[in-house]
Amino acid sequence: MEIRLVMKTARSVSLELDDGGIYKTKEVYRILVNGDEVKTTDTVITSLYGLKPDTDYEIGVEDARGTRQGEI
């Protein structure tokens, strides 16, 4: 699977989770920010809101089995 940064603002990011699905991903993924799960998603494009400006974040993606699929 590939993870791409689609858009970044001071308080949000939009990600593309490319696992071969068109609108929906082929499975559900967990989105982690600095190691903490913040949401689950089954859509190819997903967004995270409420981020703080001038702050570094590690955004990771895991499948339902907890296998790390990538990070930004």
Where are these regions (language model features)?
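Short beta-strand segments within Ig-like beta-sandwich modules, predominantly Fibronectin type-III
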Residues: 36-43
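Pro/Thr/Ser/Gly-rich low-complexity, intrinsically disordered linker/stalk tracts
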Residues: 1-25, 53, 66-72
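Predominantly extracellular/luminal cell-surface or secreted proteins
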Residues: 32-34, 62
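Alpha-helical interaction segments
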Residues: 19, 46-48
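Beta-strand-rich modules
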Residues: 48-68
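Short beta-strand elements bearing conserved aromatic residues within extracellular beta-rich modules
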Residues: 27-31
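Generic structural microfeature
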Residues: 12, 26, 43-46, 56
